[in-house]
């Protein structure tokens, strides 16, 4: 019987995607993310509330490696990667790293237990790729395979981004997705009526994962995925730019975003913890955007900015 090695790491929620990607690059065959924020006040697929849990700033990420892999080398690689993240001022919190062996049949199903279909917005439901799910009238289904990296698409920062896209997209727009990760925001943009979507990520793993997830979904031939360093060097204008990435990186996006967003277009920024909200907001205001909407879930913030000279309906900076 082939066995697997299960490695579990507990980190601050802000570092979830960066650490998930690190585990994949170290050779993981899949990751599962357990975040209490995904369950606070949420109903499961049967309409029942999940048991009451105390929300924590920490998330638990479980990765799976073949039994033949040298777990000591893997731990060393991961620790080196974590050190690099610390140097980039990524909030990691109090780290915990453990590992154990897991039988083949346990590995095949263990991480799937974390993932149920989830109605995220009025129109959008995220469904795991292996689940048979019948959509109701008007319900738009996003199919994802979370067994790779970048979580399940139900993290508060992703939810806020999806709410924002649902708010600004009316059909026929060009959208740029910065730091696409799983590709969930690009898929959602297409389902919500965008004419064309351009998805970029600096990481080759993310580009592959996004392409694989997009292939799981219908009517997504209009999504173009490529490697790219934020918005640097791009000339393609867009009606909407969405960026769900670390706050410290968002501040470097605003100037290029203003250059690329069409007049009366939108910049959506998510992934912002409350303590860094003013920093991100000021960067966008300095670039020339006007703040239209501020959304909050727990400690996470999303901002919708507009490129306009019309001050009506705009929140004061």
Curated annotation (Swiss-Prot):
GO BP terms: methylation
EC main group: transferase
GO MF annotation: an example: protein-lysine N-methyltransferase activity
Family annotation (CDD domains): AdoMet_MTases
Keywords associated with the record: Cytoplasm, Methyltransferase, S-adenosyl-L-methionine, Transferase
Pfam families referenced in this protein's UniProt entry, alphabetically: PrmA
Reactions it catalyzes: L-lysyl-[protein] + 3 S-adenosyl-L-methionine = N(6),N(6),N(6)-trimethyl-L-lysyl-[protein] + 3 S-adenosyl-L-homocysteine + 3 H(+)
Keyword set includes Methyltransferase: yes
Listed EC numbers: 2.1.1.-
Entry-linked Gene3D superfamilies: Vaccinia Virus protein VP39 (3.40.50.150)
Cellular component aspect of the GO annotation: cytoplasm
Regions that span the bilayer: none
Protein residues bound to S-adenosyl-L-methionine: 158, 179, 201, 244
Localization annotation: Cytoplasm
Stated family: Belongs to the methyltransferase superfamily. PrmA family.
Function: Methylates ribosomal protein L11.
Protein name per its UniProtKB record: Ribosomal protein L11 methyltransferase
Gene: prmA
């Amino acid at each position: 019987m082939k066995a697997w090695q299960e490695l579990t790491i507990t980190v601050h929620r802000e570092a979830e995607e960066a650490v998930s990607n690190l585990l994949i690059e170290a050779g993981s065959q899949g990751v599962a993310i357990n975040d209490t924020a995904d369950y606070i006040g949420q109903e499961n697929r049967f309409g029942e509330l999940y048991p009451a849990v105390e929300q924590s700033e920490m998330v638990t990420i479980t990765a799976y490696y073949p039994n033949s892999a040298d777990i000591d080398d893997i731990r060393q690689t991961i620790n080196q990667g974590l050190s690099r993240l610390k140097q980039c001022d990524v909030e990691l919190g109090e780290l915990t790293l453990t590992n154990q062996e897991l039988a083949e049949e346990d590995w095949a199903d263990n991480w799937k237990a974390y993932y149920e279909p989830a109605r995220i917005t009025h129109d959008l439901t995220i469904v795991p790729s292996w689940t048979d799910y019948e959509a109701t009238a008007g319900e738009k289904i996003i199919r994802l395979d979370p067994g790779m990296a970048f979580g399940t698409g139900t993290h508060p920062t992703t939810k806020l981004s999806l709410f924002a896209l649902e708010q600004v997209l009316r059909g026929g727009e060009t959208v740029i997705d910065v730091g696409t990760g799983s590709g969930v925001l690009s898929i959602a943009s297409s389902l919500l009526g965008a004419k064309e979507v351009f998805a970029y990520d600096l990481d080759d793993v993310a580009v592959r994962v996004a392409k694989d997830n997009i292939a799981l979904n219908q009517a997504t031939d209009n999504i173009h995925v490529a490697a790219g360093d934020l918005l640097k060097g791009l000339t393609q204008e867009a009606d909407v730019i969405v960026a769900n990435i670390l706050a410290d990186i968002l501040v470097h996006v605003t100037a290029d975003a203003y250059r690329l967003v069409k007049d009366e277009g939108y910049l959506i920024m998510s992934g912002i913890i409350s303590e860094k909200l003013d920093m991100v907001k000021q960067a966008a205001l300095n670039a020339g955007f006007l703040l239209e909407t501020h959304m909050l879930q727990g400690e996470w913030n999303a901002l919708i900015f507009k490129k306009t000279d019309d001050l009506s309906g705009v929140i004061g900076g």
